[in-house]
């Protein structure tokens, strides 16, 4: 029996991180590795900013008060490392269940294996990871260019009469910290796209769905649960936005009302990104539902007619009692199966899966509330929502 198909859990970078001890399966060791990488990216900027007098003052935006940087490197970056260990195995196990549960018909197994092979080729592509690294540096230089356009000195870029000038802390940020973070983000997106491509290929197969399956998704309900760990990625992105909004509210004059719409858009986009790809199974699920309703409807009609003839029209043997007869239970079972088919979902995930993802998106926004209200009130709101 195949327990997992590691379609995204691997590749050159993954093996490198394993070799240097960043990726460990056990909690404490994994947390330690993630913390080491975060400190490697963040601590030199702290030291260099302090040496230049830009730690808590000296410029309008000193290092310690740039909450977006701290959220990105001390919270979001470690979460991306955690996601490397958490998400891959869950999705790999989900891929194996297509075969384990007989969802792939024997005639479709070769095409399923082709989809697996394609995903593995993408996972192992060193060229693709080099492209991701180049994009990370391009993104870092674009961020630096944006900083040069500001009219206010920051810990990373100073506005001088001769023009903007990058600081030593800014050099580390531009050439090490930001590219490292963006590489992990872009790589996570590539891994997700690889998985979504696999799902697209599988959705094109003639799957053996069971319309009466208790998961109300023809047997594909496990996919919704497998996508819940993607909430770690949503949590990571949300942390960056939270740091940015805290800075805007505390130093940019923004308000809580002004960020409500962007937060709502962020949540909607993350739900679409993390759960939207499962919609590719909608045509097959709806076809299975229609076919099931027709077949079980015909079966229920025949059985109900026989039940009617036997027990209401005098067709039952004289020595057979209705009480205790298995006919009633069989009629109820057929009715229950028909109702279950009627309740089939058009997608292989439910409200609980979406709710878990929304919670992961909103959890990092708690510090934003703390910028405009007492921490006690924030705690009450959080406890009320969780309760």
Q: What is each of the regions a protein language model found here?
A:
Residues 1-210:
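Transmembrane-helix bundle segments that line or gate the permeation/cavity pathway
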Residues 22-43, 110-140, 171-177, 212-238, ...:
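Loop-to-transmembrane boundary segments
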Residues 55-64, 147-171, 242-265, 376-387:
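Membrane-interfacial helix-loop-helix connectors in multipass membrane proteins
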Residues 74, 172-191, 237, 261-281, ...:
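Alpha-helical membrane-embedded segments
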Residues 97-115, 155-162, 196-223, 282-319, ...:
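Juxtamembrane inter-helical linkers in multi-pass membrane proteins
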Residues 226-299, 303:
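Long, well-ordered mid-to-C-terminal structural blocks that present hydrophobic/aromatic surfaces
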Residues 353-380:
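Final/C-terminal transmembrane alpha-helix of multipass membrane proteins
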